[in-house]
Regions:
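Hydrolases whose catalytic domains are alpha/beta-hydrolase-1, hotdog thioesterase
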Residues: 94-99, 117
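Acidic catalytic loop of the alpha/beta-hydrolase fold
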Residues: 135-140, 163-164
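Catalytic histidine-centered segment of alpha/beta-hydrolase-like enzymes
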Residues: 161-176
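Conserved alpha/beta-hydrolase "acid-adjacent" motif
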Residues: 30-31, 117, 138-144
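A conserved short beta-strand
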Residues: 102-116
Length: 191
C-alpha cells in the first residue's frame, strides 16, 4: 500500500510479533522524524508497521476525536495480528479511548494531556504505555503526566521541548529526538 507514492506498510525482517498502527499528527506525517524513528525501532523489535495517512484539514464538520477513532478502527479492522500496539502523535493521541477500550499497548508522542478525555483514557488503559512530551508544549500538562506515571505509564518529560519535541536550536532538537528514540527503544525492549 502507498500514499502519494510512499509505502504505508512495513514488515520486519523476520516473523512479525504484532502490528503497530501509527496515527500521526495534524501537520506531522508518519515520515516526520519522531514517527520515523519509532517506525525503525518497531521494525527492529519485530513489529509490522501500518501507517495511517490523513489530511486532517479536509475532515469537514466531523469532530477530531471521532474522526481519529474512525481511521484507527478502520486500520485495526484490516489486521489479523493477535498483538496490536498504537502509536499516536498529537492529534493521533485522540485514539487513546479506542486503545483503552481494548487494552492496547501504546506509545503517545506529545499527547494532548490538556484534553480530559485523552488523559482519562490513558489513565484507564491497562496496557503498557509510554508518554513523551515537553514542558515548553502548551498541550502537555506536567501534573497529569505525573499522575499517569504514578498509575504505571512510562513518561519521558523533556524540560525545554515544545510540541514538536524540539527547540530553536538544531543540535538540541536532535538531542531531544535521540532521547525520545532511546525511550521508545527501552519501552519496546521491555515489551
Amino acid at each position: 500500500m502507498t500514499f502519494g507514492g510512499l509505502p504505508t506498510r512495513w514488515e520486519p525482517p523476520g516473523a512479525s510479533r504484532g502490528v503497530a498502527l501509527v496515527a500521526p499528527g495534524r501537520s506531522y506525517p508518519p515520515t516526520a522524524p519522531l514517527l520515523d524513528f519509532t517506525r525503525v525501532a518497531l521494525l527492529q523489535h519485530g513489529f509490522t508497521v501500518q501507517q495511517i495517512w490523513w489530511d486532517s484539514l479536509t475532515r469537514g464538520e466531523e469532530e477530531s476525536g471521532p474522526w481519529v477513532r474512525r481511521h484507527v478502527a478502520a486500520a485495526h479492522a484490516e489486521e489479523q495480528a493477535d498483538r496490536v500496539l498504537v502509536v499516536g502523535k498529537s492529534l493521533g493521541t485522540l485514539a487513546a479511548p479506542y486503545a483503552a477500550e481494548r487494552g492496547l499497548d501504546a506509545i503517545w508522542l506529545t499527547p494532548l494531556l490538556t484534553d480530559p478525555s485523552v488523559a482519562a483514557a490513558i489513565g484507564a488503559n491497562p496496557g503498557r504505555q509510554l508518554l513523551a512530551g515537553g514542558l515548553a508544549d502548551e498541550l502537555w500538562d506536567p501534573g497529569v503526566a505525573r499522575e499517569l506515571e504514578q498509575g504505571g505509564c512510562e513518561v519521558l518529560e523533556v524540560p525545554d521541548a515544545d510540541h514538536g519535541m524540539g527547540t530553536r536550536d538544531a543540535v538540541r532538537t536532535a538531542e531531544i529526538h535521540l532521547e525520545v528514540a532511546r525511550a521508545v527503544e527501552a519501552f519496546l525492549a521491555g515489551a
